[in-house]
């Protein structure tokens, strides 16, 4: 009887690497939104722990998070707008972010476009008072005049140009006269959109006027004090203030 190898009996494999949990080398950090929003806690993010020359803070800085404005404002009416937040500073386990951009969801944009009306768009590059260079995109649609019988609401080319000019003027005026934080406060309640709608009534009535997108083109040199001010923190030294007191000479009783 020939004695051969039993293939069913497999020998134990040597030199197998021990499986390591990749999450054991990572840490969770809290993402904090600026004070211009109602809800400050955006969520958490993972990063590799600091080892050797690789610093966790350097890996976190520059990360961009896209968050629904409905979550930041606790209001479902803002669900179609997305805000981009960029990590500029890491303090302890908190990532301090700043406004990086705004956009509409694609389903909202598609729902606005309809037949029998004119779509009017405009964009402009503006610089805020704190030297942030932004590109703002506005969108609006013509609507039926009161007591109009005609089915369509098409605007003439001259009217479109006049409306576009108004859009550019209002966006430039409102954005160039305030800081980035103040502009964010204008964008949340859609102040600019309502202003455009009101000022163009004499040219052609508009509806669904929005600043649909804000793109950050260039940011100024990083200022830690300004960022901490946005997050309601202070970069000042907490050593205390000097208190002036009147000097009183102590009189020793003779023994």
UniProtKB/Swiss-Prot annotation:
Signal peptide: none annotated. It holds the Pfam family Ribosomal_S3Ae. GO terms for cellular component: cytosol; cytosolic small ribosomal subunit. SMART domains: Ribosomal_S3Ae. The modification N-acetylalanine is found at residue 2. GO terms for biological process: translation. HAMAP family: Ribosomal_eS1_euk (MF_03122). Belongs to the eukaryotic ribosomal protein eS1 family. This is Small ribosomal subunit protein eS1. It comes from Phaeosphaeria nodorum (strain SN15 / ATCC MYA-4574 / FGSC 10173) (Glume blotch fungus).
């Amino acid at each position: 009887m020939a004695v051969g190898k039993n293939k069913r009996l497999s020998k134990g494999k040597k030199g197998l690497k021990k499986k390591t949990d990749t999450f054991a080398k990572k840490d969770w950090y809290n993402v904090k939104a600026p004070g211009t929003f109602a809800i400050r806690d955006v969520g958490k993010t993972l990063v590799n722990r600091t080892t050797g020359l690789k610093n966790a803070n350097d890996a976190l800085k520059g990360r961009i998070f896209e968050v629904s404005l409905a979550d930041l404002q606790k209001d479902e009416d803002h669900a179609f707008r997305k805000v981009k937040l960029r990590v500029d500073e890491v303090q302890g386990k908190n990532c301090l972010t700043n406004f990086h951009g705004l956009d509409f969801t694609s389903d909202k944009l598609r729902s606005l476009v309809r037949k029998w009306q004119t779509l009017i768009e405009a964009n402009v590059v503006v610089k805020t008072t704190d030297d942030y260079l932004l590109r703002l995109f506005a969108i609006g649609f013509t609507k039926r005049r009161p007591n109009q019988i005609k089915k369509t609401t098409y605007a003439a080319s001259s009217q479109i140009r006049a409306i576009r000019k108004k859009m550019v003027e209002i966006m430039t005026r409102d954005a160039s006269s305030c800081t980035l934080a103040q502009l964010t406060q204008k964008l949340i309640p859609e102040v600019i959109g309502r202003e455009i709608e009101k000022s163009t009534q004499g040219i052609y009535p508009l509806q669904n006027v929005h600043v649909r997108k804000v793109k950050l083109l260039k940011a100024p040199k990083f200022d830690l004090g300004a960022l901490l001010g946005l997050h309601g923190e202070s970069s000042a030294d907490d050593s205390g203030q000097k208190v002036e007191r009147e000097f009183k000479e102590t009189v020793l009783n003779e023994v």
